[in-house]
Amino acid sequence: PALAQDSVATTAATAPSAAAATAPAEPFQQTIAIACRFTWECVENEPCTETEFTPDITGNAGGASADALTVQSQMVSDAETVDMTGTKQVKALSLTGGGFDARHLLSIAADGASRYTVHYADGPIVISYLGTCK
């Protein structure tokens, strides 16, 4: 028991400060700057209609491997700005964000084909957009 107490005291006395305990920067860093153009809007089970929805995605990605990065970003449109997080694998990207009232999901394939959906709790209702992001 005395040894355990000494160990705890030593650990507490030598614990690094909060500033010193921050994680080192990831070896692979990347700036995210993507322009999307969605040309179809689908509301619930109604027929899809043509649209012109052009949000921009900006942010940063980092990770231990260039092939799998964690992403923190914002999607900015005329309607709103949504904080989104997710992963980037090679050229494909998957992001989620929003709050309980409106959950957002953006999927971008390696070739740029993209789907963006918003799920609203009130209703509930879902709106989907089809287009490209590059």
Set out the residue ranges of the language-model regions.
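Short, solvent-exposed loop/hinge segments that bridge or flank secondary-structure elements
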Residues: 25-67, 106
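Short hydrophobic/aromatic-rich beta-strand segments that constitute the beta-sheet cores
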Residues: 38, 66-67, 71, 114-118
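Glycine-rich, low-complexity intrinsically disordered segments
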Residues: 7-9, 49, 130
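Beta-strand secondary-structure signal
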Residues: 33-37, 117, 130
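Amphipathic/hydrophobic helical signal segments and adjacent flexible N-terminal regions
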Residues: 2-33, 41-44
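Contiguous, well-ordered beta-strand patches that form the walls/edges
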Residues: 67-104
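Short, exposed beta-strand-loop hairpins at the edges of beta-sheets
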Residues: 105-109, 115-128
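Edge beta-strand at a domain terminus
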Residues: 51-54, 121-134
